[in-house]
């Protein structure tokens, strides 16, 4: 049985965070707008002011990490990372992020596509002064593409989305966008 055939789980969006530019503290929001092709309104990657903005990738519009990973990091490695320190936009609970690569899923009314696993970076270690690189290998979160935009709120339900339930034009647009390298120019270019 494929992963998508057996996805019967339900998770929760615990926290939403954005940073206006690279290196500044993350700001926690009660709600945020996700914009297709852009990212999380007010976030450094939506405005192209992030550390990795020059390496833009269509699947890096919104980033997620599991609260269970943060718990394991503290338990197994003695490293405490608060939700505003991990530098991901969304903190989830009960969501199997590593299994969502290549899958569609809903966060509230929005639909995301799991593009690729997030890879830990030394930049985070330098920024925080905490040894997180090795402990976060293979569990650093998920980079996603926004397929259906809208508002999300802390407490929203997260669940797998059968791609057959999406409008065919949305699926085709998502697939076509994935082939673009780089995506169309940003408004300020």
Predicted regions and their residues:
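Metal-cofactor-dependent catalytic cores
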Residues: 1-189
């Amino acid at each position: 049985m494929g992963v998508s055939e057996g996805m019967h789980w339900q998770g929760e969006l615990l926290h939403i965070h954005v940073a206006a530019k690279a290196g500044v503290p993350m700001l926690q929001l009660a709600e945020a707008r996700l914009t297709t092709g852009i990212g999380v309104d007010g976030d450094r990657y939506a405005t192209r002011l992030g550390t990795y903005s020059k390496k833009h990738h269509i699947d890096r519009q919104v980033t997620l990490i599991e609260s269970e990973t943060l718990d394991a990091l503290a338990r197994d490695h003695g490293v405490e990372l608060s939700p505003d320190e991990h530098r991901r936009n969304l903190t989830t609970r009960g969501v199997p992020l590593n299994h969502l690569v290549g899958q569609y899923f809903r966060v509230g009314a929005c639909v995301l596509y799991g593009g690729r696993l997030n890879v830990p970076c030394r930049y985070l270690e330098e920024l925080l002064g905490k040894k997180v690189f090795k402990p976060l290998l293979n569990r650093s979160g998920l980079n996603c593409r926004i397929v259906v935009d809208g508002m999300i709120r802390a407490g929203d339900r997260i669940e797998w989305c059968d791609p057959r339930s999406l409008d065919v034009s949305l699926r085709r647009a998502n697939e076509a966008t994935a082939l673009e390298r780089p995506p169309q120019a940003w408004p300020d270019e």
